[in-house]
Amino acid sequence: MSFKKIIAIVLSVLILLSLLIFGFVRYLDTNRDIIISEAKIATGVDSQMLPIKVTNFFPKNTEKISAWISWRNAKINTQLLVKWHYVTDDIPIYDYSLTIPKKEGVANVVLAMPEGKSLPSGLYKVDILLGKKRLIKTLTFEIQ
């Protein structure tokens, strides 16, 4: 077999593999129950449910943190699980189940301390899962 034929076969196989992989990734992307278009950590939300003071760093004595989530192309009644975790001491804090009510929208999940108390200093993360297993997004933040 000539060198040109070997190169042609190798290139054909590579092109075929690329098409198969691209097609599979595209299939996975179009067959989701939901697409998280944005997810942000903020101090809260305004009257239009938009995040206020988006940041990943919060001062000492912070009492409340918001995890704001925007989605699209959702199947109605899709279940999300929002898991708050104190990374510094590896402590799970709070799990919140969210049932998606419409194809497109936003949600705000709040972690708040009782009045007069503040969240401990350290590193935190928020995992957003489809159902209880499939991780969709992780957000991180720090309290000084």
Placement of each model-derived feature along the sequence:
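Sequence-pattern detector for short linear motifs
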Residues: 7-8, 29
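Hydrophobic membrane-insertion alpha-helices, especially the h-region
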Residues: 9-22
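Short, low-complexity patches enriched in S/T/P/G
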Residues: 1-7
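Contiguous segments within soluble domain cores/interaction surfaces
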Residues: 25-121, 127-137
